[in-house]
């Protein structure tokens, strides 16, 4: 089994930080985390008993009735520890209120499916349940499907987490290893450098994982035979299907089957028109895949990968999980050689007379790497 890598990050500072959060304060936080940093390996190796009895459930902190649905396969090899400033609290009542505010921010401002982390540790020394052990968080793009995301919150501005919080995080990490949620083998921890860094990045690096793809056999594809694709493709075309969308895996599998039937039975195509489809559940569904031509964009189908978001996105864009999944798929395609290194990313409307992918989605992809109007 691959070793897991512990990554300290300051992601989340962008959302809740302020201009007074400077390098000196970040350094103070970094120094305060060194105790945790230096003792995690000793804790897990000694197998010390842990106490997570102070975990506050979602119900107890008043979580909004939303939720992410993408399963996380455990044990994972990576643990990402975040620090979320700007939510000072020192008792369960206030920390629960701050966590509700954070969840609302992630859902309503960031278009997330829930609070971004698997678990959070308040400055009151309690562990707060996020999305839990078995669901992917949306905390670190490119790593959500291979990592657990833990976060400190409630810390007074410019201060490191309290001794109670550090102890709670130690116990949480040790518990994760002992219960099989986190791999027991690991390398020397890495301090990840974010927008506002906690410590300098060391030489060790971690490659992003290619996202998991729901294969045709799982969503119930009809057997077909279509022209082969010559790779690498020169274009990535972003599309929307129009019509209804889906938010949970069962709905998305049904929708993909319906789209395939529409292409085959109504449009007389040899198969579903896209190489891959992205659901609002944050999952990627295999269309015709990497090696077969799609049929959504005549004149480009033999030189382009068609990636479609299921739904209509003229006014409201896809949620954060769906957008991240698509970006990870594109990055994976380039790394694996399915896209040329100098590929061009375009909207469907750039190469065909159509409103797809919708203005709201188009506005977002126009900021992505390799975009060409």
Swiss-Prot record:
SUPFAM superfamilies in the record: N-acetylmuramoyl-L-alanine amidase-like
Cite a single Pfam family from the UniProt record: Amidase_2
Q: Which residues form the signal peptide?
A: 1-17
Residues reported in the UniProt entry to bind peptidoglycan:
263, 274
Subcellular location(s) of the protein: Secreted
Q: Which UniProt keywords apply?
A: Antibiotic, Antimicrobial, Disulfide bond, Glycoprotein, Immunity, Innate immunity, Repeat, Secreted, Signal
Q: Which residues are glycosylated?
A: 22, 39, 109, 145, 247
Gene3D superfamilies, per this entry? Peptidoglycan recognition protein-like
The record's annotation in CDD domains points to: PGRP
For this chain, one GO molecular function annotation is:
N-acetylmuramoyl-L-alanine amidase activity
Task: State the GO CC annotations.
Answer: extracellular region; membrane; protein-containing complex
Q: What does this protein do?
A: Pattern receptor that binds to murein peptidoglycans (PGN) of Gram-positive bacteria. Has bactericidal activity towards Gram-positive bacteria. May kill Gram-positive bacteria by interfering with peptidoglycan biosynthesis. Also binds to Gram-negative bacteria, and has bacteriostatic activity towards Gram-negative bacteria. Plays a role in innate immunity.
- Family assignment from sequence similarity: Belongs to the N-acetylmuramoyl-L-alanine amidase 2 family.
From the Swiss-Prot or TrEMBL record, give the protein name: Peptidoglycan recognition protein 4
The organism of origin for this protein: Homo sapiens (Human)
């Amino acid at each position: 089994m691959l070793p897991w890598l512990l990554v300290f990050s300051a992601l989340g500072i962008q959302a809740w930080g302020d201009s007074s959060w400077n390098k000196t304060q970040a350094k103070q936080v970094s120094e305060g985390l060194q105790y945790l940093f230096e003792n995690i390996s000793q804790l897990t190796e000694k197998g010390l008993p842990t106490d997570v009895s102070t975990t506050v459930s979602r119900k107890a902190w008043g979580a909004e009735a939303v939720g992410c649905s993408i399963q996380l396969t455990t044990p994972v090899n990576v643990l990402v520890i975040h620090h979320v400033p700007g939510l000072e609290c020192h008792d369960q009542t206030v920390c629960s209120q701050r966590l509700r505010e954070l969840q609302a921010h992630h859902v309503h401002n960031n278009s997330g499916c829930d609070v971004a982390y698997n678990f959070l540790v308040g400055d009151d020394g309690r562990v707060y349940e996020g999305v839990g052990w078995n669901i992917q968080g949306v905390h670190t793009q490119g790593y959500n499907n291979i990592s657990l995301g833990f976060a400190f919150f409630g810390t007074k501005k410019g201060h490191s987490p309290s001794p109670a919080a550090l102890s709670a995080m130690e116990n949480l990490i040790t518990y994760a290893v002992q219960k099989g949620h986190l791999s027991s083998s690991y390398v020397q921890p890495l301090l990840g450098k974010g927008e506002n860094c906690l410590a300098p990045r060391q030489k060790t690096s971690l490659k992003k994982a290619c996202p998991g793809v729901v294969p045709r056999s799982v969503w119930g594809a009809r057997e077909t035979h279509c022209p082969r694709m010559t790779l690498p493709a020169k274009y990535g075309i972003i599309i929307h299907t129009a019509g209804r969308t889906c938010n949970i895996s069962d709905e998305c599998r049904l929708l993909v089957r319906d789209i395939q039937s529409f292409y085959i039975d109504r449009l007389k195509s040899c198969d579903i028109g896209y190489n891959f489809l992205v659901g609002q559940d944050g999952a990627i569904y295999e269309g015709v895949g990497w090696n077969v031509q799609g049929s959504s964009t005549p004149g480009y189908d033999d030189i382009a990968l068609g990636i479609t978001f299921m739904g209509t996105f003229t006014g409201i864009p896809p949620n954060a999980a769906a957008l991240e999944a698509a970006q990870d798929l594109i990055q994976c395609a380039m790394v694996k050689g399915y896209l040329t290194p100098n590929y061009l990313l375009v909207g469907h409307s750039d190469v065909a007379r159509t409103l797809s992918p919708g203005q709201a989605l188009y506005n977002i992809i126009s900021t992505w790497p390799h975009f060409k109007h």
